[in-house]
Amino acid sequence: MDKKDLFDAFDDFSQNLLVGLSEIETMKKQIQKLLEENTVLRIENGKLRERLSVIEAETETAVKNSKQGRELLEGIYNDGFHICNTFYGQRRENDEECAFCIELLYRD
């Protein structure tokens, strides 16, 4: 190998190193972007989990309150009073069933 061939080989090797370094820098930037995105998503996920637990607690309270309200209305109805919008608070004659009250009590 003469000096020119050696120099050309060294120059090619140097160019390959520069291309490799450029590719490594590109991959490094992509990894940095992915890490940042991952961090943002982890924070967002944590906030969503907190919000979900608050909503679940509110829903549980609402269901409990709804159940208590329904039981209260059922008690009033069983005591012989209307609970429907049409006759609310009026005594049911001879404790006859009222279709409006029944519908209100047993709707989903």
Swiss-Prot record:
Binds 1 zinc ion per subunit. One of its GO terms (cellular component) is nucleoid. Pfam families: YabA. InterPro entries: YabA. It is found in: Cytoplasm, Nucleoid. Keywords: Cytoplasm, DNA replication, DNA replication inhibitor, Metal-binding, Zinc. One of its GO terms (biological process) is DNA replication. It comes from the Bacteria. The keyword Heme does not apply. Zn(2+) binds at H82, C84, C98, C101. Its cofactor is Zn(2+). Homotetramer. Interacts with both DnaA and DnaN, acting as a bridge between these two proteins. Involved in control of chromosome replication initiation. Inhibits the cooperative binding of DnaA to the oriC region, thus negatively regulating initiation of chromosome replication. Inhibits the ability of DnaA-ATP to form a helix on DNA; does not disassemble preformed DnaA-DNA helices. Decreases the residence time of DnaA on the chromosome at its binding sites (oriC, replication forks and promoter-binding sites). Tethers DnaA to the replication machinery via the DNA polymerase beta sliding clamp subunit (dnaN). HAMAP family: YabA. Belongs to the YabA family. This is Replication initiation control protein YabA. It comes from Streptococcus agalactiae serotype V (strain ATCC BAA-611 / 2603 V/R). The gene is yabA.
